[in-house]
Amino acid sequence: PGNATRVLDAQGRTQPPGVRGELVGRSATMMPGSFRNEEADAAFYWRDADGVLFHRTGDIGMFDEDGFLVLLDRRKDLIISGGFNIYASDLEEKLLAHPDVADAAVIAIPSEKWGETPLGLVVPKPGRTLDAEELLSWVNAQLGRTQRISSIELRDELPRSNVGKVLKQELRKPYWEGHR
């Protein structure tokens, strides 16, 4: 009792099961906002039509048909290219399905035409040789036209945190210096 989770679209409308969106949550013990910081409140909180305060989690998810919450991605990893939302995790899943790929991350990089565009960063399996252009053709053949990866860079490894998460902010940084 007193707890709630919702999935919202970009306009703040609650989404039905099976539809992705930003996760917001509330509980009876949640603080009522930031102390004297309305700007922070605008970024981290959302109010429903009844004025009930919810915390923005920064996660993308959905409820499945059985009512279970499924976490899919982080909002900061969402790529908005030409007005289309592209989920990095969807593209990473496709890249990792290739038999010669050991690890993969997809990040947004600047694009003059689209605003942002997906870049695949791929680590080949030990002893395997990958051709970036061939892999790009292979993965894009499995994706919708608006989801396609612009290019692929091969790496020896991807930077990871102490708990094993790929440090996407570190990967994005050199591409965005001088932008935004």
Place the predicted regions along the sequence by residue.
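Conserved ATP/PPi-binding loop(s) of AMP-dependent carboxylate-activating enzymes
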Residues: 1-2, 13-46, 86
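AMP-binding/adenylate-forming catalytic core of the ANL superfamily
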Residues: 5, 25-27, 32-33, 51-53, ...
